[in-house]
Amino acid sequence: MLQQVMTNPGEIIFREVPVPEVKENQVLVKIMNIGICGSDIHVYHGKHPFTKYPVTQGHEVSGEITELGKNVTEFHVGQKVTIEPQVYCGHCYPCRHGKYNLCEELKVMGFQTTGTASEYFAVDASKVTPIPKEMSYEEGAMIEPLAVAVHGVKQMGDVAGLNIAVLGAGPIGNLVAQTAIGMGAAKVMITDISDLRLAKAKECGIDVCVNTKNKDFGEAMIEAFGPDKADVIYDCAGNNITMGQAIKYARKGSTIVLVAVFAGMAEVDLAVANDHELDIKSTMMYRHDDYIDGIRLVNEGKVHLKPLISKTFAFKDYLKAYQYIDDNRETTMKVIINVSEK
């Protein structure tokens, strides 16, 4: 079978390797689609701090089960699935308390261990989640980023009836906003400086879309929600400007959830956060229940994934996909790799 390998930043080869043998607690998955995310792009540019080369990528994935290990009874051949890419120890304090996304030894497929970018992939059945027959493989490959959004939204607890502001209308911000709406938020406003991303947000059914190049964030919140502003602000851009806006304009005593990852040390006014008694939360990846909730939201028509797909590439055009993203950063939301044809 063919397997993708990034040998060095910006260099991809394909090698012929044997189809993996399935161990007793594993399933063999024919990989159908893989999504490329921001972290993959960091690897492509040699800027991911926790990835060494060579590495086989692929952590946003969908596929079809083709073989079962002898102990696997909960799945069947031909079943559509996605794969949870976390590899955790199971013994550290977070793992023992159900928070394996915070494992002290956490590894992620495609970064610190072999990813799914091959025609077939053997994986522990515990890391496989079924997707509905009606869901496309392209959508299935986007359940992973949706799980990121679901987990992030849940950091506020129950968002039903709340007014919510989302900073950043990229793929994760868009999905956070859609998830909040799907979970019953009263009103959701999303902001960005890209009219294209805001138009995509509008297409996905997000209530209020504001370009903060043209309108002050604080003013936009009052217009959207009234003088009480938002109950929670989700920062899905992750820079000093957006986090600074969140802290400056948040209602006193309200909550800010940092969903995005800062590229460096943050320079924000924590004195204001302290003075306003802001509850600043963070979020890290996801757990299994976030996958289940994400799939349910898509299946119920409350989250729309297909509008986020900007372009698809054949498996052997993996490098061209990265080049396309570099050349079209302002207009690209999600690029999908077609590993196999159904």
Task: List the model feature ranges, each with a label.
Residues 3-21, 38-67, 82-83, 100-114:
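N-terminal glycine-rich cofactor-binding segment
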Residues 47, 193-194, 262, 286:
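Residues in the short beta-alpha loop(s) of Rossmann-like NAD(P)-binding domains
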